[in-house]
Amino acid sequence: MDCETRGRGRRGRGNRNEESRDVRLSKSLSYVLRHGASKMGLQMNSDGFVFVEELLAHQQFRSFSVDDVERVVASNDKQRFKLCKHPEDDRLQIRANQGHSVQVTDLELREISQDDQDYPREAVHGSYMKHWPSIRSQGLSRMNRTHIHLAPGLPGEGRVISGMRQSCDLAVYIDVTKAMSDGIKFFWSENGVLLTPGDAAGILAPCYFSRAQRLKPLPCDIELH
C-alpha cells in the first residue's frame, strides 16, 4: 500500500460511546504525534512517523485497536494524520501532517515560491478577539510550535478544510507576497495548511497584516492600527 492521506468523508452513524472513544483517540494521537512521543517513550522517526504497533502497546492506547486507528484517520475531516506502511518492512506507521512542537526534519512540506502560479496572495490566521491587542502590536507568534498556521481562506470557502478552528472569532489576513519578498518562507502541508516559521524570532510582524475581521456574531472589519 502506498502512503496516502486518509481523511476524506465523515464518520457514519455510530453510537455515542464509539464516537466518544474516537474523539478521545483522535486527541491522544494529536498530542503524541505533535508533541509528546519522546515524553511517552515512543520513538519518532525523522519524518515524524511512529509505528502503530508500538503506539498501541503503550498503556495509554492499549484499549484501542488498529481498526480504531484506521477509522479515526479516515473520518478526520481536517486530514490531520497520515497512515501508511513503511516502505522497507510494511509495518503500519502514523504521523501528524502539521502542528508539531517537536522538530521533524523530514516532514513532507512543499515550499512556496513567488514563481508558483497557485500560491495564495493572501492567507488567514484564525485566533480570538481577546488576543487581538497583543497580536495587533506584536504580531503573530509560532510560540512553542515550529510553524504559524494559516489557511488560504475561511473554513467552508472553496476547498479549505484546515488551518483554523471553527470556534475562532478573529481572522487576521496576511499579505503573503509582501512577506515572501522580505524573505519569510511559506510551505504547504499535505492536508492543505499553509505554514510559516515567521522571522528569525518566530514572529510574523504586523506590517504583513493586510486586514482583520471579527467573525462573530457577524463578520465585521476591524482597524489594524
From Swiss-Prot:
InterPro entries: Ptrans_KptA/Tpt1 (IPR002745), RNA_2'-PTrans_C (IPR042081), RNA_2'-PTrans_N (IPR042080). The gene is trpt1. This is tRNA 2'-phosphotransferase 1. It is an enzyme of class 2 (transferase). It comes from the Eukaryota. The keyword Transferase applies. Gene3D superfamilies: 3.20.170.30, RNA 2'-phosphotransferase, Tpt1/KptA family, N-terminal domain. GO terms for biological process: tRNA splicing, via endonucleolytic cleavage and ligation. Its EC number is 2.7.1.160. Catalyzes the last step of tRNA splicing, the transfer of the splice junction 2'-phosphate from ligated tRNA to NAD to produce ADP-ribose 1''-2'' cyclic phosphate. It catalyses: 2'-phospho-[ligated tRNA] + NAD(+) = mature tRNA + ADP-alpha-D-ribose 1'',2''-cyclic phosphate + nicotinamide. GO terms for molecular function: tRNA 2'-phosphotransferase activity. Disulfide bonds: none annotated.
